[in-house]
Amino acid sequence: MKKVRIGAVVAEFNYDITHMMLELAKEHARFLDAEITRVIAVPGVFDMPLAVKKLLLEDEIDAVITLGAVIEGATDHDQIVVQHASRKIADLALDYDKPVALGISGPGMTRLEAHQRVDYAKRAVEAAVKMYRRLKEDI
C-alpha cells in the first residue's frame, strides 16, 4: 500500500498549542504508514484556505490536514473565524477532489480546553488517511 503524503496547514496563533498538535500529527502519520511531507504555517485559522488550496494543487500531496486552536475571547470573533474557515476548507476538498481534514479545536473554548484537545491533530490525520485510501479503493 502506498504511503499517504499529507500536507499540513498550521496556525501560528496559539502556537504553543498548534506546535504540539503538529508534532502529534507527525507521530500519528508515521503510525498509519503516512507522512507529513509539507507544512505551511499561516498567521491564523482564518488564513488557512489559501494555503490549503496551494497544497491541493501540488501533485505530491495526497491529502491535507489543518491544525489550529481558536480560543474564546470577549466577542463572537472565534465563532466567525471557525465557521468561515471550515466552510471554505470543506469547499476546497470538493473543488480539488482531495481529502482535507479539520484539526481545528474551538470555538468557545478556554486555553486549558485547547491544551486538552491537542489530540484533534490525530483525528485529522486519521480522517485524511482513511478518506484517501477509501477513495482510492473505488478507482
Swiss-Prot record:
Record-listed (2S)-2-hydroxy-3-oxobutyl phosphate binding positions: 74-75, 117
Q: What is this protein called?
A: 6,7-dimethyl-8-ribityllumazine synthase
Q: Which organism is it from?
A: Methanothermobacter thermautotrophicus (strain ATCC 29096 / DSM 1053 / JCM 10044 / NBRC 100330 / Delta H) (Methanobacterium thermoautotrophicum)
Q: Which residues bind 5-amino-6-(D-ribitylamino)uracil?
A: 13, 45-47, 69-71, 102
In terms of InterPro entries, this protein maps to: LS, LS/RS, LS/RS_sf
A cellular component term from Gene Ontology for this protein is: riboflavin synthase complex
EC code(s) of this entry: 2.5.1.78
Provide a Gene Ontology MF annotation, just one.
6,7-dimethyl-8-ribityllumazine synthase activity
NCBIfam families the UniProt entry points to:
lumazine-synth
What does the record give as its pathway? Answer: Cofactor biosynthesis; riboflavin biosynthesis; riboflavin from 2-hydroxy-3-oxobutyl phosphate and 5-amino-6-(D-ribitylamino)uracil: step 1/2
Q: Please describe what this protein does.
A: Catalyzes the formation of 6,7-dimethyl-8-ribityllumazine by condensation of 5-amino-6-(D-ribitylamino)uracil with 3,4-dihydroxy-2-butanone 4-phosphate. This is the penultimate step in the biosynthesis of riboflavin.
Homology family: Belongs to the DMRL synthase family.
- GO biological process annotation, one example: riboflavin biosynthetic process
Q: Which domain of life is it from?
A: Archaea
State the gene name recorded for this protein: ribH
Q: Where is the active site?
A: 77 (proton donor)
**HAMAP family documented for this protein:** Lumazine_synth
Q: Which UniProt keywords apply?
A: Riboflavin biosynthesis, Transferase
Q: Please name the Pfam families in this protein's record.
A: DMRL_synthase
